[in-house]
């Protein structure tokens, strides 16, 4: 693999890792390169992002991990995007992600990914932007991934007084909600949204 291909792989890995970021150890293992090669690739990618006004991303190093982030210069536009009222309902992926977080909180994105079997960075960003989920600290250890929990807005949106009002599972630590429980969960959300519109 040549240098340009390595940069493409690196960028893909950083994107897929989301806000959990990647350590140089993870990069060396996944890309099968040396520590020095990983640092050189990270520096080259960072220079490309920083050296070009037409790029919307930067490479950050936080708590020993590297992650992609948006440029501060674009903050005004990102804020507008979040503030624009959205009449769209949550996607199935977002609803499933929300149910997993509700039942297993506090939970990391990687744990949610494992339950759903697919990457959930997008749905989690949507849920955070809509105020249904927030991060509440980080796990100890390598990577220091964010822990996600539901908010009081989540309780309001689903007409719940507390998390104890969620449909019961046999064992929330191991069981996933069955389809009937998920339907009840989503029906409560849709009913509360219809009441808001009246």
Swiss-Prot record:
One of its GO terms (biological process) is chromosome separation. Pfam families: SMC_ScpB. Residues 168-198 are annotated as: Disordered. It is found in: Cytoplasm. SUPFAM superfamilies: Winged helix' DNA-binding domain. The keyword Endoplasmic reticulum does not apply. The keyword GTP-binding does not apply. Keywords: Cell cycle, Cell division, Chromosome partition, Cytoplasm. InterPro entries: ScpB_csome_segregation, WH-like_DNA-bd_sf, WH_DNA-bd_sf. One of its GO terms (cellular component) is cytoplasm. Belongs to the ScpB family. Homodimer. Homodimerization may be required to stabilize the binding of ScpA to the Smc head domains. Component of a cohesin-like complex composed of ScpA, ScpB and the Smc homodimer, in which ScpA and ScpB bind to the head domain of Smc. The presence of the three proteins is required for the association of the complex with DNA. Participates in chromosomal partition during cell division. May act via the formation of a condensin-like complex containing Smc and ScpA that pull DNA away from mid-cell into both cell halves. This is Segregation and condensation protein B. It comes from Listeria monocytogenes serotype 4b (strain CLIP80459).
